[in-house]
């Protein structure tokens, strides 16, 4: 069920609070990336990619987990979202021979990258709310259907400087 995507605060309460949820999310990235073959009888590509990514049990090639990195935003740990988002983009999206995940269900993997590179992500599609990530570009502008522009500025952005100090929308601080 995708109910937890619509109610991350409720998920946090069910897990015992923000600290407990943070520990569970952290463990996904630090647990050994061990696996069993299950009914397949062989290593499927999602498992091979999880092992190659070397981020614990986080299997980016398995689309239902891709939003999980952004759940840190909902518990007041946006720097962990920013760290892991950039790490996935650096390791899995590049021009080398292994620069793209082997699984692309309905454009989800590409959409994850496009949104993440812009610096925000729709944790629950269909809900007009976005979690903050780590933009790749120093500046980008989206031209909206109503003729307005939405501009993301990440001044000083670099591989080493990937963390957001503050985010403004209509002059209101959001981080």
Feature annotation, model-predicted:
Residues 5, 10-55, 88-93:
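Extended glycan-interaction surfaces of carbohydrate-active proteins
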Residues 14, 28-38, 58-173:
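Non-catalytic C-terminal accessory modules of carbohydrate-active enzymes
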Residues 3-4, 175:
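Short, small-residue-biased leader/transition segments that mark boundaries at the very start
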């Amino acid at each position: 069920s995708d109910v937890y995507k619509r109610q991350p605060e409720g998920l946090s309460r069910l897990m015992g609070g923000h600290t407990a949820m943070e520990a569970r999310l952290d463990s996904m990235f630090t647990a050994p990336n061990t696996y069993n073959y299950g009914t397949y009888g062989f290593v499927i590509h999602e498992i091979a990619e999880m092992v190659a990514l070397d981020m614990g049990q986080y299997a980016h090639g398995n689309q239902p987990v891709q939003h999980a990195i952004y759940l840190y935003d909902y518990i007041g740990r946006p720097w962990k979202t920013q760290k892991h988002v950039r790490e996935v983009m650096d390791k899995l999206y590049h021009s080398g021979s292994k620069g793209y995940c082997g699984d692309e269900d309905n454009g989800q993997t590409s959409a994850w990258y496009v949104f993440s590179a812009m610096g925000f992500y729709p944790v629950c599609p269909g809900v007009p709310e976005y979690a903050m990530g780590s933009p790749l570009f120093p500046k980008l502008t989206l031209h909206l259907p109503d003729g307005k522009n939405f501009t993301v500025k990440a001044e000083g952005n670099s591989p080493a400087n990937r963390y957001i100090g503050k985010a403004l929308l209509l002059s209101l601080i959001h981080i």
